[in-house]
């Protein structure tokens, strides 16, 4: 009897690929949309016309965020934009597999046109030391003034330092010496909604109907099956992802929209803004010259006044 290779059968290929695809889907799809960097896949611009940053569509809870930038910068200069995403590092979040883990953070920085991520060879050594191994990305190839980062460990990076290069209006005619706004959005922890509208397991799950809970089946990694017998005798099975902590048990009566689980979310998303002035060196030099002339004029005025007082005193003595 002739032996045939396992891979010669198309059916065997399908059997082999199904678990690989499933593993890939669980590892990369479930968690990936929870951070600002993945807004790139769904939105051309991360900031809506209303001023709302699109990360808030998936991160429904709120949390504080702050940004620190210099008040003024000169053209073609590297400076720091510090984004602060504070939270209690002792708390744990529910991961996609239902286990508990630390929180990650992410941020999107919206700079004025012309400002961009500083090239590595332009970043001073002291700023490089602060940045460490962080990898920043432009939001898209044609939007280099929009930067994203994440997910990164929140326990290490509650402050994210972006190295920014200011434009030179003498070279880039689209830039001007003006005061500009800077916007930032930052999150800690996973989101509550995926871009397709489905809920993550980082949510409260409510009863789909009024009735009685007849069964709660723990399918381990696959989550839970909660069966409800409604008032008209029909049965509804609600699938709840892994990691849920139930507020109800078998035999309990529930009403429609009544919470079945606790709220596991410990993270949140926030927005902040700042201002920066792109200063013209020639204007500053002109201001210094003007101030020098004013001081010089004041000195001459004082000297002239003293000279006049001496003349007046001499005439009185005469």
Swiss-Prot record:
GO terms for cellular component: chloroplast thylakoid membrane. InterPro entries: Cyt-f_TM, Cyt_f, Cyt_f_lg_dom, Cyt_f_lg_dom_sf, Rudment_hybrid_motif. It comes from the Eukaryota. Its cofactor is heme. Binds 1 heme group covalently. Belongs to the cytochrome f family. This is Cytochrome f.
């Amino acid at each position: 009897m002739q032996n045939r290779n396992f891979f010669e059968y198309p059916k065997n290929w399908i059997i082999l690929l199904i678990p690989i695809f499933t593993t890939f889907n669980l590892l990369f799809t479930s968690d990936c949309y929870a951070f600002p960097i993945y807004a790139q896949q769904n939105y051309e611009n991360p900031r809506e016309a209303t001023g709302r940053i699109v990360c808030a569509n998936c991160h429904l809870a709120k949390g504080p965020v702050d940004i620190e930038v210099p008040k003024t910068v000169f053209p073609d200069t590297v400076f720091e934009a510090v984004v602060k995403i504070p939270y209690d590092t002792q708390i744990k979040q529910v991961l996609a597999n239902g286990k508990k883990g630390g929180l990650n953070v992410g941020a999107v920085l919206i700079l004025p046109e012309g400002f961009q991520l500083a090239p590595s060879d332009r970043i001073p050594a002291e700023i490089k030391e602060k940045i460490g191994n962080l990898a920043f990305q432009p939001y898209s190839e044609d939007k280099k003034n929009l930067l994203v980062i994440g997910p990164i460990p929140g326990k290490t990076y509650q402050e994210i330092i972006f190295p920014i290069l200011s434009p030179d209006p003498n070279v880039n005619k689209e830039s001007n010496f003006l005061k500009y706004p800077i916007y930032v959005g930052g999150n800690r922890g996973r989101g509550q909604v995926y871009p397709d509208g489905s809920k993550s397991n980082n949510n409260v799950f409510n009863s789909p109907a009024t009735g009685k809970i007849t069964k709660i089946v723990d399918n381990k990694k696959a989550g839970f099956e909660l069966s409800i017998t409604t008032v008209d005798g029909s049965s509804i099975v609600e699938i709840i992802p892994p990691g849920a902590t139930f507020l109800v048990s078998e035999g309990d009566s529930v009403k429609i929209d009544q919470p079945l689980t606790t709220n596991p979310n410990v993270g949140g998303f926030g927005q902040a803004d700042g201002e920066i002035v792109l200063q013209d060196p020639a204007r500053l030099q002109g201001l210094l010259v003007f101030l020098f002339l004013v001081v010089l004029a004041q000195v001459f005025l004082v000297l002239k006044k003293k000279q006049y007082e001496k003349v007046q005193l001499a005439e009185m003595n005469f």
